[in-house]
Design a protein with these regions (language model features):
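Terminal transmembrane helical anchor/hairpin motif
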Residues: 43-55, 182-275, 279, 484-539
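Transmembrane alpha-helical segments in integral membrane proteins
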Residues: 73-90, 161-172, 260-283, 456, ...
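Hydrophobic multi-pass inner-membrane translocation pores used for secretion
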Residues: 372-374, 397-398, 402-409, 413-425, ...
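Secretory targeting signals
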Residues: 30, 36-48, 52-72, 77, ...
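Transmembrane helix-boundary elements of multi-pass transport/secretion proteins
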Residues: 13, 17, 23-95, 353, ...
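Helix-loop-helix units of permease transmembrane domains in multi-pass membrane transporters
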Residues: 21, 81-125, 409-448, 452
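Aromatic- and glycine-rich beta-strand/loop motifs that create alpha-glucan
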Residues: 1-32, 284, 289, 294, ...
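Juxtamembrane/interface segments at transmembrane-helix termini
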Residues: 87, 91, 198-202, 277-292, ...
Length: 539
């Protein structure tokens, strides 16, 4: 084995071990097992001709439905599960070791890509294992392994490879490693899943077109009067479909052309991961081009070291006498006698109580939150405030305004973990008050952005979202330690409840949510806030 292959293997193995040691893995596997149960129970169903035809429940059909479910979920959420491979090196303080190692950037990134792909396949594989176990428990015997696993290899593996490569490339590209990249990917993932249904997909990542064509041929061969249409119906149903006509289908025909196209997606993912080495900074601590330009412009240069001539600090006052530096009349006859009350005696006890100043704490949290936002974000916020006052009745403006503070909300509970200041906050005099102040800042920002719609447009229902969303961000950040959990949950709620105008999940006053929805979000806000504030700090 050459040195490059050895480095690739050990990089992938080390990163995969780190991912598998994550305490959240068990919850993710449990969710995948439950999804396997939903597939077998008929709650996640694939039908043709307006939900009139479905395949016979054999291994090929169940394996295809399971593979489509896994590929769909990996496309939407896999990015957020594998993102952070490079930031984990920075937070773990192993970045200098990687930067100084002889491993090439291409080899290092390919190792990260391999481990992320395998991690997603572990999650998807748990769905396949659970489906096989449930088959046995229902007394139907062990399903045939080849028809069950063939769609998994054809459709899930390429999806996992491409999603991991995109996540790695976003981390290497400047400006896309944070919340902005997560938002852009979410819209791209939705487009990748919707475009095949509309017949306008240049690349069929999930393989929907191939599966539909194969099923359509089987339906027409057994039911000539049927019209399969442009695409099948695939989704979650509260109750299994009844009185459906079944057709026998033995799976997608594996041809050389199909294998070449699906393998090409895997190779494209590897090429994208290798190409990410071009913008990859290899954890270079040198300042960015913005900092370099700022230092070249006229103005105060904060990088200039202070000397005795340039220092603005006052001279040191008298300190306690030491053996090496005698003070007082005995040590220096020409020195004045020290004051009767030495300066260090004015420090007082470190255990003296500190008065809580709520407004001062809120102002500090507000400065911390806004200081981390870019100038573009702040200008956009001002534009949204002005637009809200100009056209307060626009629901489209509401949808955009509810998306704009996402970077701020995602930092509410995860900021201390990312900056390694969580122990300091936990040992401060009022850690719970600090969390309440952070939530208040998260509520004040959307309140300012939505001032026009709230005061002039009559969208008072948005107030429940003002209370709920920052509580969700604070609780999710404190639970996971990263912004990814909140980003996943919130983007789904935003897309379904606001962008898709589903009143049952509307928290932003867009679709006129019923009273039950408003009460539910209000209770959820109270529970999440109390839990996030009172939960003890964990290292």
């Amino acid at each position: 084995m050459s040195s490059a292959l050895r480095a690739w293997f050990h990089t992938a193995l080390s990163d995969l071990r780190t991912r598998l040691r994550d305490r959240r893995l068990l919850m993710m596997v449990a969710a995948c097992v439950y999804l396997g149960h939903l597939v077998l129970a008929g709650r996640i169903e694939l039908t043709l001709v307006d939900r009139s035809y479905r395949g016979a429940a054999n291994a090929a059909w169940m394996g295809t439905v399971l593979s489509l479910t896994a590929a769909f979920l990996l496309t939407l959420f896999g990015f957020y599960l594998v993102r952070g491979a490079l930031s984990r090196e920075r937070q773990g303080r192993t970045a200098p070791l990687v930067a100084a190692s002889p491993v090439r950037s291409v080899t290092y990134l390919l190792g990260k890509w391999t481990s992320g792909t395998l991690f997603l396949l572990v999650l998807a594989g748990s769905m396949a294992v659970s489906l096989a176990v449930l088959f046995v428990l229902r007394g139907e015997g062990l399903p045939a392994p080849v028809p069950l696993l063939t769609p998994f290899l054809l459709f899930v593996v390429p999806t996992a490879a491409v999603v991991t490569a995109v996540a790695l490339a976003f981390e290497c590209l400047p400006g896309l490693g944070g919340t902005v990249g997560g938002i852009l990917y979410f819209f791209g993932a939705v487009a990748a899943t919707v475009a095949p249904v509309l017949g306008a997909a240049p690349v069929d990542l999930l393989g929907m077109g191939v599966i539909h064509d194969s099923m359509s041929q089987a339906v027409l061969a057994q039911y000539p009067e049927a019209d399969p249409g442009a695409m099948f119906s695939f989704g979650y149903y509260r109750a299994p479909a009844e009185q459906l006509k079944t057709f026998q289908w033995d799976g997608v025909a594996v041809t050389a052309d199909l294998l070449a196209r699906r393998a090409g997606l895997v190779l494209a993912g590897g090429a994208l991961a290798a190409g990410a080495a071009l913008p990859f900074d290899r954890f270079d601590p040198s300042p960015s081009w913005r900092a370099t330009l700022r230092s070249a412009l006229p103005g105060p240069n904060t990088s200039t070291p202070k000397t005795e001539a340039t220092s603005t600090e006052p001279p040191a006052t008298a300190g306690p006498p030491t053996a090496g530096h005698p003070s007082g009349p005995e040590g220096r006859p020409d020195a004045p006698a020290p004051a009767e009350s030495a300066p260090w005696s004015l420090l007082g006890s470190l255990s003296a109580p500190v008065a809580l100043r709520p407004f001062g704490l809120f102002a500090v949290e507000c400065r911390r939150a806004l200081r981390r936002r870019s100038g573009t974000w702040q200008v956009g916020a001002l534009v949204l405030v002005g637009a809200g006052l100009w056209i307060p009745g626009s629901t489209g403006l509401l949808v955009v305004a509810w998306l704009w503070p996402l970077p701020l909300w995602s930092d509410l509970g995860a900021r201390e973990t990312a900056t390694r200041t969580a122990p300091l906050v936990a040992s401060s005099p009022y850690p719970r008050a600090q969390r309440v102040a952070a939530w208040a800042v998260g509520a004040a920002v959307p309140l300012a952005l939505l001032a026009g719609p709230l005061l002039l447009g009559g969208h008072w229902r948005a107030l429940v979202g003002v209370l709920f969303v920052p509580a969700l961000g604070l609780a999710a950040g404190r639970l996971s330690g990263t912004p990814r959990l909140f980003e996943i949950v919130y983007l789904v709620l935003w897309y379904v409840g606001l962008a898709s105008r589903q009143a049952a999940l509307d928290f932003g006053g867009v679709a006129h949510a019923p009273p039950g929805t408003l009460v539910g979000y209000g209770l959820a806000a109270a529970v999440l806030l109390v839990g996030a504030v009172t939960a003890p700090h964990t290292a």
